[in-house]
Each structure stands twice: as structure tokens, then as C-alpha cells.
């Protein structure tokens, strides 16, 4: 077996998104270094830390730096193997789109779900080996973030918080393995720790499935929980149409990498991709102000540079006052990404055509309108505005600007939204739009 094959086999043996990772997850559960009590605490702490990161954008540039290195590595691979490059980009969500399920990847490339996993695994093996042999990429961003000397618990907590904050649960295990390998952890260590990450994700994905959770595990929904969000809704004129009775998303609705929970309000099981989406569904299910809701109610078609794409907003909800809102889930800083702004424009148009309001729910205390109003130094904003007048800003130029100004990720997102700049990812490029 070649080194590439060993790398690919190790990557693949971290498991398949859910059920198929049972062996890796069970093995991880027997590891004496993380007890069941510590594992449960890790899941809770990661969720809380993820919410804090989603709210503040804390260390967001560090996560962007990681994706920038990955995008450069994938770009080199795509030059020789275009399909591999596209598959890795779609699986990890490097271009700002959400990570895709293996079922969806299989449909995209005309192969089975298992074959999509094999192709991804082979591609990652080739990419990691090439990066380690060439030494051309600065892998210190991984080594600094996931040091080899850290405890299992600390590494798992860090990875889970990042996954939750970036809404990337679908590819959480794959990202964990890849980040650890590039940080210098050996094959078996990376595989084992990725198994821990899978355990935690699978735990919150299946929490409350088929039945109501015990009262001590239910998340209380305050009576006024929806008040600030209803003020952020972009309302439509006219009478709202009825809610659909089934999800518009059908192709990968039952993919093993997705999560499920029982809804008391709907008296059935509901489905979601991420921890953030699960929080939204629980808020809808537990709020007395919400009469009914439907997950993935509509197919939204949008266009990115001539490429037609499809998106399914997280939910539509009818409130007790008769108003209806189409809701999408996007982490706060990510609302400024070009792909998400285009999706939001298309989603708003669709919602208003149905007489529904439109809301981007961020999982933080702030929404898009709050981000637009965020105060950033006028001097710093003018500095970036003047720099963009001379041409696009790439990652290297942005890093110099950040070092001289000290801005954080939410500052950048606020300036992008206010000035209608275009923020592309994978690789990063900031452009002034005429």
C-alpha cells in the first residue's frame, strides 16, 4: 500500500457521517482518556462556546485563515484533478456555501453516496500528502490552533466549538480529521480524535429523536424570545399563503449525516443539518407565540456568476397573530459572504411573493440590521475603502490591513454590508462593486 493509500484509508476509516462511523465512535467511547462525564461536558461546553463565537466573531479570522490555506491546497489539486477539487470544496464548504451531505455530493457527480465518500477520501489523502511533502503551505495556522501536546478533551472542545460557530456539522468529522493531520497529529491520533468529535455531533443530532426529551434536558423558551427577532423581519404586504405540509428538500433529507428531533407542536419528527438549525427548531417548537412551522419549506433558485444553484431555507413559521415568516440560518459574520447575500436576496423575493416575511436568524443576540449598524472606526473604514478603489484585496493585503488596524471579523462583515462590497471565499477576495 502506498503512502497515499495509507493516508486515504486512514481518512476514510474515520467513518461515514453517521451510522457508518459507529466503529470509530464506539472505539472512541472506550478510550479511557475521555470519560462519559467529560464527553457530555465537552458537548455542552462546545455548544456554549460555539454560541459565544457566533455572537462575537471571536477568533473568526483564525478560522478564515485555515480555510484560506485549505482553499489554496484544493486549488492546486484542482489544477490536475478538477473533479477532486470541486468535491472537496463542496464537502467542506470552502467557498462560503454550507457543506454538502454525501448523498447530495453523489447526486452532483452521478455516483452513489458510498462512492462519493471514497472519492472524497482519496482526494483528501492526496492533498494531505502533497502538502506535507512540498512544504509550500504555511501549516502553522493548524499547529498553533491544535497543538500536538494538548489534551484530548481540549482539542475536541476546540473543534466542536468551531464546528458549531461556523454551522458546519455536516462535515464536522471530516474537518476535524483534516485539521488535526495538517497540525502534525499522526494518522491514528487524528482518526481517534475525529471519532470523539463524531460522537459529540451524533449526540446532539439524535437528541430528542422519536420522543420528547426529559424535562431536565429541555431548553426553556422565554415568552419574549421572539420579540427582538420579529422586529428584524422584513415583512411583506398582503395576506400570507398557507404553510406547505412537507419539506421541499427531498433528495438528501434522510442522509445519515443529518440530525433529527421530535416536535411536540407538530407531533412528528423534524430534521436539520446543524446545531444552529436544531436550536431554531427548538425555539419554534417551544414558543407559545408560534402556531406551526415546517422545516425546509421552499426551494430557492439563485445565480452565482452564471451558475444556477438551489437553496432550502431552514423553516417557515406561522405565529399566533397570523403572520408568517420564512427563516434562514446563517452565522452572523457569514451573512456578509457574497453567496449568502445573493441567497438572502432570492429568499426575500420568494417570501414576499408568498406574503411571508423574511428573516435571517444568526443564533446570536444580533441580526443583520445590528451588524449593519455596528460601529467601526471611520478612519479604518475609509482606509479600506480607499484601498479597494485601487483594486481587489486578497488575503495577504487583508492581513496587512488587519495588523495595522486591529479590526475583527465582525468589523469586516459590517463594512462589507454597509458598502455593498463583494466578499468571496475559497480563496478570499474582497472587491468593490460598481
Residues of each region from the PLM?
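DNA major-groove recognition helix of helix-turn-helix
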Residues: 120-127, 131
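Electrostatic, structured charged patches in enzyme active sites and in nucleic-acid/phosphate-binding
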Residues: 193-434
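Short amphipathic alpha-helical boundary/capping segments
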Residues: 68-81
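Extended alpha-helical scaffolding regions
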Residues: 158-222
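Short amphipathic alpha helix immediately N-terminal
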Residues: 79-99
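Intrinsically disordered, low-complexity basic tails/linkers immediately adjacent to helix-turn-helix/homeobox/MYB/SANT
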Residues: 133-164, 433-434
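Helix-turn-helix DNA-binding module
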Residues: 95-112
Amino acid at each position: 500500500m502506498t503512502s497515499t493509500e495509507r493516508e486515504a484509508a486512514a481518512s476514510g476509516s474515520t467513518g461515514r457521517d453517521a451510522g457508518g462511523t459507529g466503529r470509530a465512535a464506539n472505539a472512541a467511547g472506550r478510550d479511557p482518556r475521555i470519560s462519559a462525564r467529560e464527553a457530555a461536558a465537552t458537548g455542552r461546553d462546545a455548544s456554549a462556546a460555539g454560541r459565544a463565537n457566533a455572537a462575537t466573531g471571536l477568533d473568526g479570522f483564525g478560522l478564515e485563515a485555515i480555510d484560506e490555506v485549505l482553499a489554496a491546497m484544493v486549488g492546486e489539486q484542482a489544477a490536475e484533478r478538477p473533479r477532486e477539487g470541486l468535491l472537496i470544496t463542496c464537502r467542506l464548504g470552502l467557498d462560503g456555501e454550507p457543506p454538502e451531505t454525501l448523498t447530495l455530493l453523489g447526486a452532483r457527480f452521478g455516483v452513489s453516496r458510498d462512492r462519493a465518500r471514497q472519492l472524497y477520501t482519496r482526494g483528501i489523502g492526496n492533498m494531505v500528502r502533497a502538502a506535507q511533502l512540498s512544504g509550500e503551505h504555511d501549516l502553522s495556522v493548524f499547529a498553533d490552533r491544535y497543538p500536538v501536546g494538548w489534551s484530548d478533551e481540549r482539542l475536541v472542545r476546540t473543534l466542536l466549538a468551531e464546528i458549531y460557530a461556523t454551522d458546519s456539522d455536516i462535515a464536522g468529522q471530516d474537518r476535524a480529521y483534516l485539521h488535526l493531520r495538517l497540525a502534525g497529529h499522526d494518522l491514528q491520533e487524528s482518526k481517534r480524535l475525529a471519532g470523539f468529535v463524531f460522537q459529540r455531533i451524533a449526540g446532539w443530532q439524535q437528541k430528542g429523536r422519536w420522543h420528547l426529551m426529559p424535562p431536565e434536558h429541555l431548553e426553556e423558551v422565554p415568552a419574549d424570545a421572539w420579540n427582538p427577532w420579529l422586529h428584524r423581519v422584513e415583512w411583506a404586504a398582503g395576506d400570507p399563503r398557507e404553510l406547505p405540509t412537507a419539506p421541499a428538500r427531498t433528495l438528501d433529507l434522510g442522509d445519515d449525516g443529518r440530525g433529527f428531533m421530535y416536535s411536540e407542536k407538530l407531533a412528528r419528527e423534524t430534521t436539520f443539518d446543524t446545531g444552529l438549525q436544531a436550536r431554531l427548531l427548538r425555539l419554534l417548537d417551544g414558543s407559545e407565540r408560534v402556531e406551526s412551522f415546517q422545516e425546509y419549506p421552499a426551494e430557492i433558485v439563485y445565480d452565482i456568476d452564471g451558475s444556477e444553484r438551489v437553496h432550502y431555507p431552514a423553516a417557515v413559521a406561522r405565529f399566533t397573530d397570523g403572520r408568517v415568516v420564512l427563516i434562514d440560518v446563517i452565522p452572523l459574520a457569514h451573512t456578509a459572504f457574497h453567496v449568502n447575500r445573493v441567497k438572502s436576496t432570492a429568499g426575500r423575493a420568494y417570501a414576499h411573493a408568498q406574503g411571508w416575511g423574511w428573516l435571517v436568524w444568526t443564533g446570536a443576540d444580533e441580526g443583520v440590521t445590528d451588524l449593519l449598524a455596528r460601529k467601526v472606526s471611520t478612519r479604518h473604514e475609509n482606509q479600506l475603502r480607499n484601498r479597494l478603489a485601487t483594486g481587489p484585496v486578497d488575503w495577504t493585503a487583508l492581513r496587512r490591513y488587519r495588523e495595522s488596524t486591529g479590526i475583527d471579523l465582525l468589523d469586516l462583515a459590517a463594512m462589507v454590508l454597509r458598502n455593498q462590497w463583494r466578499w468571496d471565499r475559497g480563496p478570499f477576495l474582497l472587491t468593490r462593486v460598481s
